[in-house]
């Protein structure tokens, strides 16, 4: 179901002090920062922020109407380590400086048509941007219900000199499920019997 546009969404995020307002300088990342690119309604990142108060979490989302859906839960948890930035993922290396601990790509748009390949968040163009803002020991974490995007992402990472730590086609029956926090899409598709693909990778030399 398509969300109804909320013209006040960005104002709500700012009112509750979740919104990062960009100035002329870049936003600083460090080894205590976890970044989710395309956070959607923020179901996963909000739970992660609650579970890990020692870390700082930033959700990057293009659409304020979607991002604002996380406010109720974030307020309920009284989170002080969670912020949102409204911007386009393609500008990620222009927005941030420094290097973060983790980059999450969760249930990204698969852009299935060949002519849209460069829009996929695991295309080599994006991987080169992530390389600039991920710590040398940092991890890129990917999960998706889309098998085609999973196969594309695995190939793209390998061909772009990223080291695959682990990957698989059934996250919920893996050793990682115990510490897995689900997104809305994840709950929806796994409830219908769809297995969830995952990839964990580090940048190569």
Swiss-Prot record:
A Pfam family for this UniProt protein?
Methyltransf_4
EC number(s) given by UniProt? 2.1.1.33
Cellular component aspect of the GO annotation: tRNA methyltransferase complex
Tell me which residues this entry annotates as catalytic.
109
The alphabetical list of record keywords is:
Methyltransferase, S-adenosyl-L-methionine, Transferase, tRNA processing
Q: Where does S-adenosyl-L-methionine bind?
A: 36, 61, 88, 109
Provide the reaction this enzyme catalyses.
guanosine(46) in tRNA + S-adenosyl-L-methionine = N(7)-methylguanosine(46) in tRNA + S-adenosyl-L-homocysteine
Q: Where is the signal peptide?
A: none
For the region Interaction with RNA, what residue ranges are annotated? Answer: 115-120
Residues binding substrate: 113, 145, 183-186
Annotated GO MF terms: tRNA (guanine(46)-N7)-methyltransferase activity
Q: Give the pathway annotation.
A: tRNA modification; N(7)-methylguanine-tRNA biosynthesis
* Entry's family note: Belongs to the class I-like SAM-binding methyltransferase superfamily. TrmB family.
Tell me, in a sentence or two, what this protein's role is. Answer: Catalyzes the formation of N(7)-methylguanine at position 46 (m7G46) in tRNA.
From the Swiss-Prot or TrEMBL record, give the protein name: tRNA (guanine-N(7)-)-methyltransferase
| Species per Swiss-Prot/TrEMBL record | Mycoplasmopsis agalactiae (strain NCTC 10123 / CIP 59.7 / PG2)
Gene name? trmB
């Amino acid at each position: 179901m398509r969300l109804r546009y909320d013209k006040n969404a960005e104002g709500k995020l700012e009112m509750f002090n979740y919104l990062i307002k960009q100035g002329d300088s870049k936003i600083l990342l460090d080894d205590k920062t976890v970044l989710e690119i395309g956070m959607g309604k923020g179901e996963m990142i909000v739970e992660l922020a609650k579970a890990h108060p020692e870390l700082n979490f930033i959700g990057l989302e293009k659409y304020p109407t979607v991002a604002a859906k996380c406010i109720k839960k974030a307020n309920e948890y009284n989170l002080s380590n969670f912020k949102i930035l409204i911007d386009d993922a393609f500008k990620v290396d222009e927005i941030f400086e420094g290097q973060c601990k983790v980059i999450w790509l969760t249930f990204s748009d698969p852009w299935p048509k060949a002519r849209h390949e460069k829009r996929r968040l695991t295309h080599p163009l994006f991987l080169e941007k992530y390389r600039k803002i991920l710590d040398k020991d940092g991890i890129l974490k990917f999960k998706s219900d889309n098998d085609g995007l999973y196969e594309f992402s695995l190939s793209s990472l390998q061909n772009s000199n990223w080291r695959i730590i682990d990957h698989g086609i059934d996250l919920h029956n893996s050793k990682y499920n115990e510490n897995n926090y689900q997104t809305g899409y994840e709950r929806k598709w796994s409830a219908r019997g769809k297995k969830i693909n995952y990839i964990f990778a580090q940048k190569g030399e």
